[in-house]
């Protein structure tokens, strides 16, 4: 009975495979939105203000960071929790594949969230005249919460490594 339960639990990790594949569909959707934004701004490139262009570019950078985060979570999560990726020898391989454990993935995700939040906050500040003060305050508080959380997670991981 014990062996059956252990085998069933171990095999159930494959339930995550479609979830990671679903993230790749999210990446497709993000790519479509990215190019939709470019197609939207290009016809107006000579009439758009500098600040509007910068806001659009920040949106593109934001989407790029989210896309990188999706790729990182997809591949690292799959390798850590489902199965090792079998990539042919002749094919290009990402240098970090197989080297990122759950802790380093967590730290990279936290750092990515801080970067994404920073860009979002910069976009908000560039349009600050149209944003109520209390909303600006909450954006800053939320961003600082992300920064503090990432810092604390990194610090705790360092403490944990020193103890082991």
Curated annotation (Swiss-Prot):
Keywords: Cell membrane, Membrane, Transmembrane, Transmembrane helix. It is a multi-pass membrane protein. It is found in: Cell membrane. Its main location: membrane. Disulfide bonds: none annotated. Pfam families: UPF0114. InterPro entries: UPF0114 (IPR005134), UPF0114_bac (IPR020761). NCBIfam families: HI0507. This is UPF0114 protein KPK_0696. It comes from Klebsiella pneumoniae (strain 342).
């Amino acid at each position: 009975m014990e062996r059956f339960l252990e085998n069933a639990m171990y095999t159930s990790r494959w339930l995550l495979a479609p979830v990671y594949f679903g993230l790749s569909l999210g990446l497709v959707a993000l790519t479509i939105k990215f190019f939709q934004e470019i197609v939207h701004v290009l016809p107006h490139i000579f009439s758009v203000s500098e600040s509007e262009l910068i806001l659009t570019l920040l949106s593109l950078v934001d989407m790029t960071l989210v896309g990188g985060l999706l790729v990182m979570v997809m591949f690292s999560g799959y390798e850590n929790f489902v199965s090792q990726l079998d990539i042919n020898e002749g094919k290009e391989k990402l240098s970090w594949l197989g080297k990122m454990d759950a802790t380093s993935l967590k730290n990279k995700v936290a750092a990515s969230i801080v970067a994404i939040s920073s860009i979002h906050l910069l976009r908000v500040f560039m349009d600050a005249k149209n944003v109520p003060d209390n909303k600006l305050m909450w954006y800053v508080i939320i961003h600082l919460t992300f920064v503090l959380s990432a810092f604390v997670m990194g610090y705790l991981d360092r403490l944990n490594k020193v103890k082991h």
